[in-house]
Amino acid sequence: MKYLTNEKLTIVGAGGMIGSNMAQTALMLGLTPNICLYDIFEPGVHGVAEEMYHCGFEGANITWTVDPEVAFKDAKYIISSGGAPRKEGMTREDLLKGNCQIAAQFGDYIKKYCPDVKHVVVIFNPADVTALTALIHSGLKPEQLTSLAALDSTRLQSNLAKEFGVPQSAVTGAHTYGGHGEQMAVFASQVKIDGKPLSEMGLSAEKMAEIKQNTIQGGSANIKLRGRSSFQSPAYNAVKMIEAAMGGAPFTLPAGTYVNNEKYQNVMMAMPTTIDATGCHYVMPQGTAEELAALDASYAHLCKMRDEIVALGIVPAVADWKKDNANL
């Protein structure tokens, strides 16, 4: 089997459903034979490793550990789902304190054991703030660390495809930006259905509002259906992000990236992005006045959560971030 690279990929939280799916997806896509599975729950991560061995992936060098030094040492790529999952009735924001404490430790491990890592993807919620926490603590450059945000856009795309009875791939330009949560900004003004602008499809304002709400609640709806938070879709998209960073096909769905410009300062937020072997690059979104206002509101919500983790002492005040990360 031919692999994209031989460099070490570490999967954090590998004993869980997202982590185990990431391991299998990375091997099925042929990213690298050298995969280290890390979790604090030994029976879980051991069991996942055994499952991967039983798959019989050609040339694979799968290891597992509960020791962070072993897991992070010499890692060139890392994906972390190592936080508490969302349960029914919870918002992503309900996970803020505990998961940001985990993210701070995660960033410290990167700085201590693998400062030369090339790219890191954070996918545990609230992903915008856990990723920001990890970035501050890790010392990495902003383009080296991203958070998963693509699911909101694929949910919007899926909802529109179902509405018009077309294949999902026939829906283009369906994106969400800002926060990965209840305050996400849905951008639909550039959507096309089979090449035809959405504005020409006769969709009522009421139906579009319903589609937007279903998109925002897509994760919680899945929890109600399956009794657990999503795991296959985040696993797949996170691995595709890392594949792009390894030099595979660029990842062009929105990703959470560090933004500090004239309009939005010192936050991680979903933007129009491209991930490739040189890192994550973003441009400012184009949209209607209503869409841009929704993005401003989402940014304000992200600032509020950022200020909460500052108040909790998980990260320092913004003015002091450079003391922990000279790249910010």
Regions found by a protein language model. Give the residues of each.
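A short, basic/flexible loop-to-alpha-helix module at the beginning of a structural domain
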Residues: 1-7
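C-terminal substrate-binding/catalytic lobe of Rossmann-fold NAD(P)-dependent dehydrogenases
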Residues: 137-143, 153-328
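Conserved N-terminal Rossmann-fold NAD(P) cofactor-binding segment
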Residues: 6, 31-75, 307-309, 314
